[in-house]
C-alpha cells in the first residue's frame, strides 16, 4: 500500500528533467538503490547488536525524516497550471495498468520491460540460495557479494551512465546495457568458483545502463501532465512480473538442485534469464527500428 515512493520519484525526475537529461537522471535512482544496498546492511548489522527490533526503529526514523524533507523542503515538480486534476476513477491499480493502452507508440518497450524484469528475478529471488548451494558461502559472504553489487550499481548508474548515454545516445546505450546484462547472466549460469561472482558481477552491473535509457526513451513520448500515471502503470506492470518471476526462478532452481533431478545445474535460473533477456533485446531492436519515437 505504501510502495509508491519509487513511482513518485520516477515521475518527479521525469517532470524536472530535460529530454536530453532524463536517462542520466533516472540513473540517479539506481545509484541511490546501490548505495542503499551498501549502507543498509552495514547500519542494520551494527544496530542489530542492540536488539532485533532496533534496525526497524531506525528504518522508521529515516522514513519519517524523508517525509518531513519531502513535505517541507522538496519543491513541487510542476506548476499548478500544468498539473492534471485528481480523478478517483483513475486512482486504482487496475485503472493505472489499463492506462498503458493509451500509449501504443511504446508497447514494444513495455514488452521489453516485462521480459527484463522477469529475468531480474534470477538474481533477486535465488541469489542467496545460489551462492550458498554453488559455493558453500556463509551469510557474511552473501552480504559482501550484495554490497559489492550495490557498489557497482552506484558506480554505473551514478557515474558511468552520465558519460555513456550523452556519447552513445539512449538507444545504443539500451542495446549496450542489455548485451552486457545477457553476457553477465550467462556467465553466472556457468560460474563454478567463488571469485567468479565478483568478476562476473561487472558485466551484470553494466547492464544497469539499459533501465535508465529505456525510461528516458519512454518518458520523452509521454505528455508532461501524465508522467505520474504512466510511472504508476509501469510500477503495476513490474509488480505483476514480481509475481511471475519468483515462481519461475525459484521452482527452476529447486528442480535443478534437488536430489531427484536428472541434471544438477544451480545456474539454470540465470541461463533462462539470459534467454528471456535476449528475447527482450530482439523485441527492442525490432520495435525501435520500425517506430518513430522521440529518443
Regions found by a protein language model. Give the residues of each.
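Multi-pass alpha-helical transporter architecture, strongest
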Residues: 67-73, 271-295
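Short amphipathic helix-loop junctions that connect adjacent transmembrane helices
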Residues: 125-142
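C-terminal transmembrane helical hairpin of 12-TM major facilitator-type secondary transporters
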Residues: 171-214
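Helix-to-loop junctions at the C-terminal end of transmembrane segments
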Residues: 156-170
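Helix-loop-helix hairpin linking two adjacent transmembrane segments in secondary transporters
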Residues: 29-72
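A membrane-interface helix-boundary motif in multi-pass transporters
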Residues: 48-61, 251-277
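Cytoplasmic helix-loop-helix junction between adjacent transmembrane helices
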Residues: 1-34
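Juxtamembrane intracellular "pre-TM" segments in multi-pass secondary transporters
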Residues: 75-112, 133-134
Amino acid at each position: 500500500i505504501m510502495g509508491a515512493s519509487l513511482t513518485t520519484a520516477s515521475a518527479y525526475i521525469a517532470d524536472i528533467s530535460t529530454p536530453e537529461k532524463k536517462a542520466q537522471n533516472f540513473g540517479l535512482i539506481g545509484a541511490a538503490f546501490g548505495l542503499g544496498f551498501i549502507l543498509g546492511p552495514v547500519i542494520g548489522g551494527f544496530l542489530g547488536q542492540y536488539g532485533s527490533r532496533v534496525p526497524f526503529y531506525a528504518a522508521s526514523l529515516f522514513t519519517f525524516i524523508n517525509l518531513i524533507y519531502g513535505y517541507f523542503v522538496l519543491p513541487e515538480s510542476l506548476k499548478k497550471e500544468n498539473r492534471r486534476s485528481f480523478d478517483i476513477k483513475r486512482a486504482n491499480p487496475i485503472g493505472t495498468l489499463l492506462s498503458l493502452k493509451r500509449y501504443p507508440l511504446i508497447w514494444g518497450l513495455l514488452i521489453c520491460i516485462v521480459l527484463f524484469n522477469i529475468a531480474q528475478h534470477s538474481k533477486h529471488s535465488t541469489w542467496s540460495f545460489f551462492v550458498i548451494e554453488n559455493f558453500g558461502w556463509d551469510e557474511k559472504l552473501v552480504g559482501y557479494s550484495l554490497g559489492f553489487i550495490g557498489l557497482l550499481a552506484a558506480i554505473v548508474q551514478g557515474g558511468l551512465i552520465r558519460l555513456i548515454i550523452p556519447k552513445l545516445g539512449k538507444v545504443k546505450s539500451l542495446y549496450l546495457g542489455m548485451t552486457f546484462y545477457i553476457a553477465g547472466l550467462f556467465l553466472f549460469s556457468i560460474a563454478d568458483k567463488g571469485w567468479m561472482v565478483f568478476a562476473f558481477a561487472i558485466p551484470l552491473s553494466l547492464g544497469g545502463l539499459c533501465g535508465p535509457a529505456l525510461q528516458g526513451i519512454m518518458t520523452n513520448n509521454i505528455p508532461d501532465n501524465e508522467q505520474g500515471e504512466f510511472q504508476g502503470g509501469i510500477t503495476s506492470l513490474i509488480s505483476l512480473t514480481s509475481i511471475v518471476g519468483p515462481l519461475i526462478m525459484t521452482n527452476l532452481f529447486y528442480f535443478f538442485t534437488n536430489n531427484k533431478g536428472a541434471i544438477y545445474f544451480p545456474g539454470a535460473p540465470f541461463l533462462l534469464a539470459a534467454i528471456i533477456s535476449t528475447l527482450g533485446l530482439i523485441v527492442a531492436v525490432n520495435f525501435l527500428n520500425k517506430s518513430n519515437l522521440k529518443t
